[in-house]
Amino acid sequence: MAKYNDSKCRICRREGGKLFLKGDRCYTDKCAFDRRPYAPGQHGRARKKNSDYAVQLREKQKVRRMYGLLEKQFHSYFVKADMSKGVTGSNLLSILERRLDNVIYRLGFANSRSQARQMVRHGIFTVNGRKATIPSIQVKVGDVIEVREKNRKMPVIAEAQEVIARRGCPSWLEADGPNFRGVVKALPQREDIQFPMSEQLIVELYSK
């Protein structure tokens, strides 16, 4: 699991946008980025012209930190995406979206990806009836993700329907809150990812 010593709010401010690292708090007026939408530190407000490399690096760091990954694992996903058929950038985002911890987050069973990762490691979910404890599992079309019966009274699980109503569920997933389950209906497409990101900049960075 990727660990950062810096506060999550400072990470968002450094990357210049909300990465939703603190879950529901990011949707409220308590969000630090809404109050101070500039980089942390003494010179955070200063305007500076970034080189092409700096822009590419910043975009890669933003996406990597949003999904909570270390550089080695993120780069391995890029290599896999580059070797697959299709557009490398779109392939990369599809791989990131199909991680089990991200799917748990998208289904509304966790407030953030980091919380989803922790819940998966604790064995709270099953995939196709088998307990899953590896956050990086790549889900496939037709996979059924369920909350284990003994964990269904957890507050964060009980609030799943409310979270889905507030945050929405992507079209490639089907959330069934009352039955504590979700189904992968299709593979995620680029248009399914609403978060503003320029994956082509990441491709350009790693292609140097």
From Swiss-Prot:
Q: Which InterPro entries match?
A: Ribosomal_uS4 (IPR022801), Ribosomal_uS4_bac-type (IPR005709), Ribosomal_uS4_CS (IPR018079), Ribosomal_uS4_N (IPR001912), S4_RNA-bd (IPR002942), S4_RNA-bd_sf (IPR036986)
- What keywords does the record list, in alphabetical order? Ribonucleoprotein, Ribosomal protein, RNA-binding, rRNA-binding
UniProt GO BP: ribosomal small subunit biogenesis; translation
PROSITE patterns (alphabetical): RIBOSOMAL_S4 (PS00632), S4 (PS50889)
> Which SMART domains does this chain map to?
Ribosomal_S4, S4
CDD domains linked: S4
Write the protein's name. Small ribosomal subunit protein uS4
| Species, as recorded | Oleidesulfovibrio alaskensis (strain ATCC BAA-1058 / DSM 17464 / G20) (Desulfovibrio alaskensis)
Q: What is the lineage of its organism?
A: Bacteria, Pseudomonadati, Thermodesulfobacteriota, Desulfovibrionia, Desulfovibrionales
State the gene name recorded for this protein: rpsD
